[in-house]
Amino acid sequence: MREDLLRNSVEFLREKTVLDAPDVKKIEFLKSKGLTAEEIQEAFKLAKNPLFPSYPRFENTSNFVSRDWRDWFIMGVISTGFAWSAYSLVKKYIAPMFRAPSQNAYEADKNALDAKFLEAHKILENLDEQTRKLSERTEKQQDELDIALDDLEETLNTLKRTSENRDREIARISQDVYTMSTITLPQSLEQIKKSQEEALQNLSREISSLRCLQTDSKKDDTFATTSNSSIPVLENPLDTSEGFQTKKVGTASLPDWQISMHNEASKNIDFNDIDPAESYVAEDAY
């Protein structure tokens, strides 16, 4: 059997509030607690047994001792001492708890509260001042930050515009370089080549003409030397300041304009500086 459950059932059946209840309700209650029929019967048996063994009662036949005045006096003194001690304790420790404070205590408490209020007011003022300074500092920093952001935005816009201008300039330069390399430069080189060819042709013609003049001049000098003995010469020199030279009169002399051109060209050109190869090229071109 389950001893603990059985013991609890016995204690339940011995309670005063349960003794007057019908057995049917007791059995139903014990069954609801999980007891079996055997355990319930055992519990009823144990509950009916007395808790303590019965002993025979003996009557106290002794007479009470009578008390005299001394006993009462001692009892009174002891009671008075206890009462006085209790009164002293109550007066010293308990009564002040319920006693109203004096005017001085009120004033002291009031002054203490005023001091606390003043201290709290100062703390609040300091807190308000610090909050105001913090707010001003925050606003100032916000303004500086806004200015810095505006400057940064302006700088970025400037850099963007500069980059766009640089890109356009690079594109223009690239276009110019492309145009120059594909159109302008070839045309210029072609024009320079043509100009050089024309200059070389002109120079070759001039050199050929000068060579012819030089050849004619040599022939004239030879002819004049051979005919000096038989042909009279009119010695009538012209003014050299006007750039004229002496004329040779004879039957085989050159015209005056050809002689003047030959002499003028001979003064300005040194035929020793002419490259024979260039002369050959000029003669071929001519």
UniProtKB/Swiss-Prot annotation:
Keywords attached to this Swiss-Prot or TrEMBL record, sorted alphabetically, are: Coiled coil, Membrane, Peroxisome, Protein transport, Translocation, Transport
Localization, per the record, is:
Peroxisome membrane
Q: Locate the region Disordered.
A: 218-239
Q: What is the residue range of the motif SH3-binding?
A: 61-69
The Gene Ontology biological process terms listed for this entry are: protein import into peroxisome matrix, docking; protein targeting to peroxisome
Q: Coiled-coil ranges per the record?
A: 122-214
Q: Name one GO molecular function term.
A: signaling receptor binding
User: For this UniProt entry, what's an example GO CC term?
Assistant: peroxisomal importomer complex
Topological relation to the membrane, as annotated: Peripheral membrane protein
Q: Which domain of life is it from?
A: Eukaryota
Location, primary (coarse class): membrane
Entry keyword annotation includes Coiled coil: yes
Among Pfam families, the record links this protein to:
Pex14_N
Q: Give the protein family.
A: Belongs to the peroxin-14 family.
Summary of the function given for this chain in its UniProt record? Component of the PEX13-PEX14 docking complex, a translocon channel that specifically mediates the import of peroxisomal cargo proteins bound to PEX5 receptor. The PEX13-PEX14 docking complex forms a large import pore which can be opened to a diameter of about 9 nm. Mechanistically, PEX5 receptor along with cargo proteins associates with the PEX14 subunit of the PEX13-PEX14 docking complex in the cytosol, leading to the insertion of the receptor into the organelle membrane with the concomitant translocation of the cargo into the peroxisome matrix.
Q: How does it assemble?
A: Interacts with PEX13 (via SH3 domain); forming the PEX13-PEX14 docking complex. Interacts with PEX5 (via WxxxF/Y motifs).
Name this protein carries in UniProt: Peroxisomal membrane protein pex14
Q: Give the species.
A: Schizosaccharomyces pombe (strain 972 / ATCC 24843)
User: Corresponding gene?
Assistant: pex14
